[in-house]
């Protein structure tokens, strides 16, 4: 039995196998994951429910704060629900209840084991796991225990409330504290078997505080869950690409391999293993561009690096980083088939690297140089974006952003923009309203020399849909304490007024209040035959039209019998109104 002692897996690089996302596969070919098809008898029933085949989790009753306790509990629930909601998977979670105050991580400790997957905030000390581990400097920390066949047996997650402040309101975009739904979503990635992703805007990547790209699962995590926990026959509908990365005929370990779709979005990224091989599985069929780029040296500081081997996992500390990035190679992926695409890279230190991102701003001098992915909304225009490094060219280079719906102005050079000597290359960017949402990449080119920041700019969709139900999360969050709850689903009718949440969203009414109704009368046409009333409706619902004459204190009288709507609009002809002024109203019936 082997155990993890870090947020990422501490394993030997020589035995490592990776996929599009980063997982651990042992020498026997076993993938690190929960066995939800035929749960291992050695896994306690308090950890995995063998009847429902769901991973059970418990939330510590003493949350981060007492004032915001309910929202914090619901944020934890929402994170598990988002992972479970990825279409086409068997991944399932169920809440087991609350764990008592003072709980600790102890997965795999034969003496202290409690057979409980727990999520809690450490509030008194950064020493956890019985004092064995210090989480100082870490926002979150996940410990998993797994058997020799790589079956996860138990896992615990702790969030650091000693050194960090936490909040739950995803609309509070100015808050620089830690968003529960970002960090915990990241940690659950480790909880189910993932290491850090090399894709900048992935959830299981190095994320920024506050509300940013880490919130909501990326295409990289979607591919990961579909590969680790697929429904029967799912993988036969998805494509894969594999190959080797070589330099002078020798294997290149730890090279980043990135798949970019036809829209210019990074859909998956991985790193090559010790024999130079890589695999990008569980990708939707279609046309892709694949490229290979070096990670930054593990000896580089945070400000002198964007993504290092040690940022992915300790196993990649000695990743080969002295080779030049490649150009893109096109490939068409077909469902149920694995294509092969090999790369031969050229040795040598890249002339320049990107080691920081300047987040979008409408101010020309609001420059930043963080290691985190940035976000921009579709339809935004005249925003400055940029990349940072001490090695970037100070002239004669071009900054571009991949993908459709993007126009970018001339490159602006700001040598020594930062006190530590880093240069800035920036440009004005415009994002079309119909730009395909997803993770874009920054590219700097000078002659034949290239540098990439893969997936470090997220183009946001018109509305967030973190739980993959095709419905606007903001509406669900506004009216439901837990936006992933069954009663918040688009076709649910929690107030039992006969209208679904989706209909009430479209008409601007409150789905939790049966007295909140709205269906507009769209037109009233008077002819010799009478008055024709047309109003908005919901198919299958019953409506009654009422009218009254233009006489003071007159009462409303029904016009004809109730009508059952057959579409989004309904009509009624009132023949009695051919020669008199009348007022109309429409009432939805139970």
Q: Predicted regions span which residues?
A:
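Beta-strand/beta-sandwich contexts
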Residues: 348-401, 411, 449-464
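Short, ordered, surface-exposed loop/turn motifs in non-cytosolic proteins
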Residues: 241, 247-270, 284-287
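Metzincin-family zinc-dependent endopeptidase catalytic domain
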Residues: 22-29, 72-187, 191-195, 256, ...
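Structured interaction patches on ligand/partner-binding surfaces of diverse proteins
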Residues: 295-340, 563-565
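A short, amphipathic beta-strand motif
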Residues: 239-247, 276, 343
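Immunoglobulin-like IPT/TIG beta-sandwich domains and homologous Ig-like subdomains
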Residues: 378-448
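Short, composition-biased motifs enriched in small/polar/acidic residues
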Residues: 462-590
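Disordered inhibitory propeptide/activation segment of secreted metzincin zinc metalloprotease zymogens
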Residues: 18-69, 125-152, 234, 318-325, ...
